[in-house]
């Protein structure tokens, strides 16, 4: 297609920003470009920044399994998805990094000599979001252009009318030669329908209408007895070969609606689906609703599902074994699940309303250039709480021009507050009145970027955005406050997750003798762990900075799950322990926002399982993992002269094990579950002077998920096999 060729020809530009419909295959163009460069002898490093871990898995797997395969080793490339990878310690390799901006920041801090030649920022519209995550884009790009090799930067965004705005997020010296392109061409066709059950009308939407009165035309009435599910079922039954996605506003809603929808459906007795259902029962819990739904060709797709379960569901959906998926905003965030029919039951993304960008990104799931060229979108209004006006606006109105978050996300009061705190010598930013948690997170991280840029004399994007709030005297005062300090007071650094008051508390604690507790018989002791977490809570002031996660009143429960996670328990064991804990400790579950005493019913068990999976994903593997990383990094700096040390609990959290063998295989890119499977099957590995190696027999071990994963690993790490 002409528009794709036009974009492809710009990927060698020094700086290029482009936007187009979700369906045009923007990330596919990046992958084709990288493959072409590598096969033609280019030696250098690529990085793709993506907003979610789900996209890391999808894109890295496509690069390894579809694009390069054995060409990776032939051309001396490794695909890297984490800063813990052993490959980053080798100086003779080329890298394709697929990471989130947060992971990229820690990789750049840990490996100051690594440069990136091509930086692709996928889903670049995230730079517009007024939250703390957008701050990482400013930080990472600024750090990269300070490196020996300045990268070429390519930004890709969906449906944005002004893609050139994201060039404003890049440092000034990166923008000497820039280009941008917007295309509205899509190679796929969509039909959009609005089903108003309350008014009993079925409309088609006309995108070519010249006036609002012509946008919607009624094609039929809707029965007085129709329900949301009866309409969905009637449409699906017209062609049962079609794939269907049903969008819901939240995880609880997606699970509830999936169960209601599947209640009247028969079991399919499909061998592949039954095997997947058995895997869900074995690896999560026998009472978990998802397993029963899968047997009927139905599933739900929510963020807390274990990665390999989620990807296997996606594969079965693409192969049309699973025909209908109920999903949440994980789908908006770029996971490539193509649909013939998309049913939208809410215009909310969690609690807030969907933005026009999110809505266009969502409906872009219908009709995908790699899968199908035609699809239908059905927006269903079935409740008075749904605004007819809002639904029609989302369909009719174009996406407004976007701004970067540093421009639109911070107001004058917030910027003045940041400057005044820095003038007072403090990076302790407290949440302002009427400030939501997302804006507070952005303000705090921007403040930490600003003080670092001022003390380093960097004329960064963030620094320039404060030009109207800082004069020369103010800059001199801030430099004096943060550079003329004694050795005990930390200087500003590149880590925007932690402020100097937190770092100073940590330094004092480590100098005072704080260490990770010793293991007892090779295991983590719950009481020792809880005591250590309480110390970290005071050091890092979680009550102030982490109110919604580790600063909440659930730390004892988090410690229960974390102990089992670090000791290498399987998910099914952890889920059963979580159920038992709630049963034995008079726990409670939240249903529709209300706390209800736990009664050990299957409903309550499923709520506990969902909650526990969410804690592992969002609290243990994100919040707690980050704080343990901070502790370990500072401990190395102060105690071990930068060297690795025994009993590093950050590793135990990150890898979910204290076992060196399991950790070794995960450092080579193998997942926790597969690494643990290998540990339990001695016949599949040997120990050499260079570490553990896998026997080729493991590729036919009989466990499908293990075989599939290790075949991918064999392309990326062939030296791991004997």
PLM features: residue spans?
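N-terminal helicase ATP-binding lobe
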Residues: 1-722
